Amino acid sequence: MSIFFERHNILCSINVDYDTCLYIYGNKQIQELLINNKFIAIEISENYPDLSDEDYIISFLLTLTDNVWLDDFGSGNATMKALIKNKYHAIKLDKSFFQEHMIKPHFDVIISNLKKLCPNIIAEGVENIDCHKLSKGIGLWGAQGYFFPSIPLTEIESIDSKWLSDL
């Protein structure tokens, strides 16, 4: 399965909460899995406790993989300080935040300022072709939502390479 992700240069993201991060911190086998599988991204929820403070667990995870993302940014639980404290590989915008602000004239300024702290911005809530075009038009690094078909991991090899490159 790792061959698929590596061949297409795509990432497989996994949502983790505080307890899961603690488990990874204490489990050498999972740490090795993350080190040896560069296509796995860890999405840390914005609900992670004290996200804006120094945190030895997040710092440790950042030593295991370059693919640590902050999830649900804009839902109101993290400040810019959280982005300054940790050098995340990507920031995923909260679905409601993206859908509320994407058509406002100041949205590109918000994205531009976020990119100063983390160049890879992902939009959650891309539900149709218009949202997808908008996310590409403002230079977002990635998009997630119902616009993209969901398939079981066991069928991932069936994804058409042309479809992936057209995104």
Q: What is each residue range found by the language model?
A:
Residues 1-56:
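Catalytic core of bacterial c-di-GMP phosphodiesterases, primarily the EAL and HD-GYP domains
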Residues 2, 20, 43-50, 67, ...:
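EAL-family c-di-GMP phosphodiesterase catalytic domain
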Residues 37, 63-64:
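Short loop/turn elements that form and flank the Walker-type P-loop nucleotide-binding site
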Residues 56-57, 79:
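Hydrophobic alpha-helical segments, principally membrane-spanning helices and signal/leader peptides
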Residues 58, 62:
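Donor nucleotide-activated moiety binding/catalytic core segment of transferases
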